[in-house]
Structures are given as C-alpha cells and as structure tokens.
C-alpha cells in the first residue's frame, strides 16, 4: 500500500510529517511528485506553483532550493475540525528528492516527473532524477512515472540500472 503524496488527507502533503505518518501506519511506500528548482534541484512537490500549499507564491522553477525550504508547507493544511495544526511545524517543510531518499531508505517510492517535457526543467529533470536515484543506491525501490510520455522516454535514455518505469496514460490505453 502506497500513501498518495505521503498521505495528504492526514498531514500536509509531501512533507516529512506526511511521510513519517505513512511509515507509522506500516505502509509500503509513497506516491510522490518531483519538480525542478531554479538551481536545478529536485523537490518533492506536486504543483507548478507553491501558492496552494505554502505561505509563498510563484513557480517552483523561479525559486532556489534554499528559498523553497524556508516556506511553511503546513500553512494551508486544515484538519477535519478546520484547524491549521501544522502551521509553522518544523517538519512541515518542502523536502528535496535526495532528502526523501535519505530519510526513508526502506520505503518504496513511486515518483512522478511533473515538469512538462517542453520546458527547460522538463528537459533536464529526467537526468537529475536518475542521478539522484543512483547516488543513493535506490534503484531497487523507486518506480519512475510521468503523465508525459516524453519524460519516460527521456528517463529511459539514462536508465542503465534497470530502475522500474511506469507506463504513460497513452501506453495504458493502448
């Protein structure tokens, strides 16, 4: 069983709070998303803009990793009582993909490349994710997916380590 965005209904999505909670529940892994920052680092983040889930604004690609790590990723999260219990929490921060791999060495990770293939970020993200996976020896526990078929094709060009690859929507429909 995988926690979607780390378990976004229970904790601020794609934060250490969410991933820790999924581990505590005994889940097998996480479904997560990655985007490339201005300084070409991968972060664990779904949206192209930081506005919906943080106290910041603008595109992920217009901020450095250091700038993004200063944002409060628990800022807009509300619980079932419409409270904001994780606002300002030290584990409600944006994680880099490398941090995710380091913090959870025994968890499976289904990672979705979000950056569109026709953007600068999209052109280099497949190589960056491949390099991160190899650097952390995580090739046996990561599945790389994307709604963009071109991203899977690009990742495949680098993939000499037999890292699992998910089918695109078009491939599933065929």
Residue ranges and their predicted role:
Residues 1-174:
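Phosphate-group recognition and catalysis centered on beta-loop-alpha active-site segments
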